[in-house]
A protein has these predicted regions:
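Alpha/beta-hydrolase fold catalytic core
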Residues: 1-25, 46-50, 83, 87-88, ...
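Conserved HGGG/HGGXW glycine-rich cap/lid loop of the alpha/beta-hydrolase fold
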Residues: 11-67, 71
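Conserved acidic catalytic loop of the alpha/beta-hydrolase fold
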Residues: 73-90
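Gly/Ala-rich beta-loop-alpha elbow adjacent to hydrolase catalytic centers
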Residues: 94, 98, 102
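Conserved alpha/beta-hydrolase catalytic His-Asp/Glu region
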Residues: 126-132, 144-204
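Short beta-strand/loop motif that positions the catalytic acidic residue
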Residues: 205, 211-213, 217
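Catalytic histidine-centered segment of alpha/beta-hydrolase-like enzymes
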Residues: 243-252, 256
Length: 265
């Protein structure tokens, strides 16, 4: 993987690119993560496809731009980044929040989309309760209590029975949160609060779609996951039987195989 720092529109972006492969897969990380979350997953892919990872603006070492990073703004930034590195078409894979960005990309740049993968993510807008929870997180960060997020969020991402086995990965994710700019966390929370529902867009997209879901996901509970699958017969679905919200870490080989099968068509 070749590390790059590029200007994508008005955003200074940190990118890694394997640079080789007829087909390209772009991996978009989730909230409170950065591109390093894919570090052990990428080697399962790059012998078969070109792989691009990046720090979404507001996380990692990509620059924060204002008090809100809307999903549309982030999608435009991704498109500009792909222009810079010479990628015309790609399969966009979005983990959790990255899935919301991927959906916005699909809506705005469908002609550049080979396929869309929602990895532990949904096309639904935030419920009122979820919006209130995000507002509480904003208040925590602004009051200097980010460590509370670090204490809770990473561990909650893993299935209960996997937490001891992935203790090192959980601690790495906690460290990532400590190193993430407060302003970036707030900008992305504001963007997620404002995002719209994308189910109708998915129905009309006319591109290959894959949902990868964890049976033991504490963030996307079974009722929501089942509802999403039932409402979107246009999507292929892969269930990770032993994963929570972090299937590319909890069941990496199964996750990678599903993704590569999808990309190959």
């Amino acid at each position: 993987m070749v590390e790059k720092f590029i200007m994508a529109g008005d955003a200074a972006l940190h990118v890694c690119d394997s640079e080789v492969g007829d087909k390209c897969v772009v991996l978009l990380h989730g909230y409170l993560e950065n591109m390093l979350v894919w570090e052990d997953f990428v080697p399962l892919l790059y012998k078969d496809v070109r792989v691009v990872t990046l720090d979404i603006p507001g996380h990692g070492i990509s620059v924060v731009n204002g008090e809100i990073h809307t999903m549309d703004y982030l999608a435009d930034t991704i498109a500009a980044a792909l222009d810079k590195i010479g990628v015309e078409h790609a399969t966009i894979v979005g983990h959790s929040m990255g899935g919301y960005v991927a959906l916005a990309f699909a809506e705005r740049y469908a002609e550049r989309l080979d396929g869309l993968v929602l990895l532990h993510s949904t096309p639904y807008a935030d419920s009122d309760e979820k919006k209130k929870n995000r507002q509480r997180e904003i208040s925590l960060v602004k009051s200097g209590k980010k460590e509370l997020l670090a204490h809770i969020a990473p561990e909650a991402g893993f299935a209960v029975e996997n937490r001891n086995r992935f203790r090192t990965e959980i601690e790495d994710l906690q460290q990532t949160i400590y190193l993430t700019e407060d302003a970036g966390i707030v900008a992305l929370l504001n963007g997620m609060i404002e995002r719209k529902a994308q189910s109708e867009m998915l129905h009309a997209l006319g591109k290959p779609i894959l949902f990868i879901l964890g049976r033991k996901d504490g963030y996307i509970v079974p009722e929501i996951a089942d509802k999403m699958v039932a409402e979107h017969p246009e999507a292929d679905v892969v269930w990770l039987e032993n994963s929570g919200h972090m299937g590319f870490i909890e069941e990496p080989k199964t996750c990678a195989a599903a993704l590569l099968d999808f990309v190959r068509g």
